[in-house]
């Protein structure tokens, strides 16, 4: 019997349906899984015909799966004028495509269990993520449907990474200024990468494995990140990604135009919003929980921490821009910035890989 691990807030999540301002049936190409597709072929009557006409078949040449065709306004054709799903209304929730049932939930499978989470792109999920206080809490349950399939070596390697991530969680929630915390996380990640490499590729017995202290062991990640040259390069990288919605481009170009002022006034912003600094702790924890264990696939431990640091710092950068532009950062504005970042970055693997590889310290050279 395996386990399922979830953030403690996971069980509180409820889709707000037609009240959502960022409808996940608008602007997203929604794939149709094979089981749902097979069922939809059997639905009778006028609705069945309209349902099938709304689906673009899979393309064997490109590998693109079957998906709902978006209309001219980039809406799912089965989203009615009240922003309610007609599949749900006509056939029931259990007949919705798998991605529609799951979103914004995501799942990561391991040798003897699974981790579930909620994506920051959803405003109801973002509300829960930002609201947490104190150290991150998780619910772990045994699950009949999750089997133990891994080898002892695979499980051991996973446990090493889980332990490393727990250490990062503790650092992320320390009562310390954001920059000090970011520097400690970066240095810890550098040490963890060395430990992980030693585990995977141990030195032959008798060979000296001690290494001299490197610049990365002592460098200030925050000092390097908050330089105008670094932020200019980073924003240009973000603007070069495929952009889904214009509000994201507007945020990035606005921030880029005011970088000197953002850098100069950032400490004033952090002082003014000191009561909400736990939100950045929560974001660090969220990005670490969602992405760190992917190091099992590429052994890039440090890159996963870099992704969490850059992601959280970019959101903070946009918060400062919002504060300068409008005189305040409302709770709703913070949710909008977070969900825009997640929508534009986290659901494109190329984007996350490039941000994870973006070398902040190299920008100082």
Predicted regions and their residues:
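Hydrophobic, aromatic-lined core segments that form the binding pocket/scaffold
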Residues: 175-365
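Short runs of predominantly hydrophobic/aromatic residues within well-ordered alpha helices
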Residues: 17, 21, 161, 165, ...
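Internal, well-ordered alpha/beta segment that forms a basic, Gly-enriched binding/recognition surface
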Residues: 83, 90-183
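Short glycine-rich, low-complexity/disordered patches
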Residues: 51-65, 180-185, 328
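Immediate flanking context of iron-sulfur cluster ligation sites
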Residues: 2-20, 55-97, 114
């Amino acid at each position: 019997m395996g386990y399922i691990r979830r953030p403690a807030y996971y069980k509180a999540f409820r889709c707000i349906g037609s009240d959502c301002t960022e409808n996940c049936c608008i602007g997203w190409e929604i794939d149709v899984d094979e089981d749902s597709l097979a069922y939809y072929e059997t639905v009778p009557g006028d609705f069945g015909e309209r349902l099938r006409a709304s689906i673009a078949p899979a393309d064997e040449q490109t590998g693109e799966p079957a998906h709902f065709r978006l209309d001219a306004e980039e809406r799912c054709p089965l989203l009615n004028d009240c922003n309610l799903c007609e599949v749900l209304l006509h056939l029931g929730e259990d007949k919705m495509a798998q991605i529609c049932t799951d979103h914004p939930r995501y799942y990561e499978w391991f040798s003897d269990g699974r981790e579930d989470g909620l994506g920051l792109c959803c405003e109801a999920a973002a509300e829960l993520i930002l609201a947490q206080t104190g150290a991150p809490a998780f619910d772990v349950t045994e699950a009949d449907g999750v089997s133990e399939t891994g080898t002892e070596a695979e499980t051991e390697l996973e446990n090493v990474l889980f332990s490393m991530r727990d250490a990062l969680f503790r650092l992320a929630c320390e009562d310390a200024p954001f920059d000090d915390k970011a520097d400690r996380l970066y240095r810890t990640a550098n040490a963890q990468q060395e430990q992980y490499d030693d585990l995977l590729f141990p030195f032959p017995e008798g060979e000296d494995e001690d290494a001299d202290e490197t610049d990365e062991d002592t460098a200030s990640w925050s000092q390097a990140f908050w330089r105008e040259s670094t932020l200019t390069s980073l924003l240009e990288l973000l603007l070069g990604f495929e952009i889904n919605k214009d509000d994201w481009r507007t945020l990035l170009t606005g921030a880029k135009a005011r970088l000197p002022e953002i850098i100069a006034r950032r400490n004033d912003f952090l002082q003014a919003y000191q009561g909400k600094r736990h939100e950045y702790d929560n974001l660090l924890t969220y990005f670490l929980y969602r992405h760190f264990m992917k190091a099992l696939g590429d052994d890039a431990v440090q890159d996963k921490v870099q992704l969490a640091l850059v992601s959280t710092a970019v959101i903070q950068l946009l918060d400062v821009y919002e504060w300068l532009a409008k005189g305040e950062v409302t709770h709703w504005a913070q949710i909008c910035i977070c969900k825009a970042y997640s929508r534009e970055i986290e659901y494109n693997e190329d984007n996350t890989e490039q941000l994870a590889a973006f070398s902040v310290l190299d920008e100082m050279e």
